[in-house]
Amino acid sequence: MTGISRIGDKDSRNDTNNNGSSDVFANGLGVVRYGDLDTRGDAMIESSSTVFINNKQVSRIGDKDTRGDAIVEGSSDVLVN
């Protein structure tokens, strides 16, 4: 199980996830999902195949965006496969 990504978490290029769910939260922050964008405009293209929020797959620590940058920050206590 891996921590989910939230708005404000960073990737390996130090970009910040700035899009995510407006109504589902982890630790008070919106959850990042497949297709959500970071500050460079790169979309998440890797995500959980089994957990969905707002009909989109949930992104986790280690998942990558269109530039190939992996999420390096996330929730330490909200975990998914």
Predicted regions and their residues:
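Intrinsically disordered, low-complexity proline/glycine-rich segments
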Residues: 1-81
